[in-house]
């Protein structure tokens, strides 16, 4: 954001709303998970949005995180030995993380854009992506997730049912209650049309 001047008017209002979505408590939980998942050598960021952004900005920690969710020998992202210092290399590393996260199962609507992290435009979107990644890791339960499973919501899983042909045929003969009564046609309790209601006291 060093090359970008301050925003005014409507742009400032929009940026202010985006910044209010950032959750500091969630940041603590995500940092805790990343440290447990990747190991203590990743260090810890300074508290706050800026510290979190600087910590993840070069893409190396994110790449280590997504690699740690895969079994040994099938790591999707190549992590450089020395963290990249050139801007385009850092952005490329973040883009590789995003591709690997998408391949892991994170849906497009949960993904942040590279500039959201690199320029700190929408750190709440970065949090959303990491939450989605953590939720998927807990849901898959393949032994690669490390940390407290209660840190993330477990996603609902598909429960596929197979019916036999005879069960499907039986279902055709059942009158569903969506179609009205299943007790047969009857005019019990009906009054004749045009006849006034009889009120007896």
Swiss-Prot record:
Positions in coiled-coil regions: none
Keywords from the named record: Acetylation, Cytoplasm, Methylation, Muscle protein, Phosphoprotein
Signals that turn on the gene: By growth factors.
SMART domains documented for this protein: CH (SM00033)
Positions of modified residues (N-acetylalanine): 2
Biological processes per GO annotation: epithelial cell differentiation
Calponin-like repeat positions: 175-200
Calponin-homology (CH) domain sequence ranges: 24-137
Subcellular location(s) per record: Cytoplasm
Cystine pairs: none
Modified residues annotated as N6-acetyllysine in this record: 172
Matching InterPro entries: Calponin-like, Calponin_repeat, CH_dom, CH_dom_sf, SM22_calponin
Residue list for modification Omega-N-methylarginine: 183
Record-level GO cellular component terms: cytoplasm
List of residues that carry Phosphoserine: 166, 181
Purpose: Actin cross-linking/gelling protein.
Family affiliation: Belongs to the calponin family.
Entry protein name: Transgelin
Encoding gene per record: Tagln
